[in-house]
Regions:
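Short, solvent-exposed loop/edge segments of extracellular or virion-exposed proteins
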Residues: 1-4, 80-100
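Structural beta-strand segments of beta-rich domains
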Residues: 7-11, 103-107
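Short strand-edge motifs at loop-to-beta-strand transitions and within beta-strands
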Residues: 38-42, 134-138
Length: 171
């Protein structure tokens, strides 16, 4: 997917044995020599900016034959804010107060598009995902007893960045 939470990524590949390999990215050029099996890696030493970073890799074999590969890597080092609320059908008291008479409430909110979410409430942990627009909705499959229930919502985006929110719902 070429998305990473590291702004100094390591590029790896395979080419002709002992070929000279250059990587151009972020206005800098990095070089290395492939090993006897053709394996190589280059660590970008200067931090790349957030967002899309095009790159070019060129390999030149000892016989002069060369090849070029172009691509891009997306740097995403920042976790996006997450929101959580009770759905309008579950929010039976004053809107937004997280007090409800619904024992299997539906939570909804926003996170980064495609983020993996984990809701921990009581001794249960549930995993689900945000859609392509970053919206998510989850209905508890098990009834909550009357009282205050603490929850933790964790979102992990595709680059591995983590956002966490905590709160409580009262039944």
């Amino acid at each position: 997917d070429n998305i990473t939470g590291c702004n100094k990524p390591v590029f790896t590949g395979t080419t002709a044995p002992e070929a000279e390999v250059t990587l151009t990215i972020g206005g800098k050029t990095y070089s290395t020599k492939a090993d006897v099996n053709g394996r190589w890696n280059i660590t970008v030493s200067d931090p790349l900016p957030e967002g899309s970073n095009p790159y070019t890799v060129q390999a030149t074999a000892s016989n002069g034959a060369s090849g070029t590969l172009q691509g891009g890597v997306v740097i995403d080092t920042q976790a996006q804010e997450i929101t959580v609320s009770l759905s309008s059908a579950s929010d039976t008291g004053v809107k937004g107060d997280f007090i409800t008479q619904v024992t299997t409430p539906t939570f909804n909110g926003t996170a980064e598009a495609g983020a993996r979410l984990t809701l921990a409430i009581g001794s249960s942990v549930y995993t689900f995902a945000a859609d392509a627009s970053g919206r998510w909705s989850f209905t508890l499959p098990e009834q909550l007893q009357d009282g205050v229930h603490q929850y933790t919502l964790t979102a992990t985006d595709i680059a591995g960045n983590i956002s966490t929110g905590t709160g409580s719902v009262t039944i």
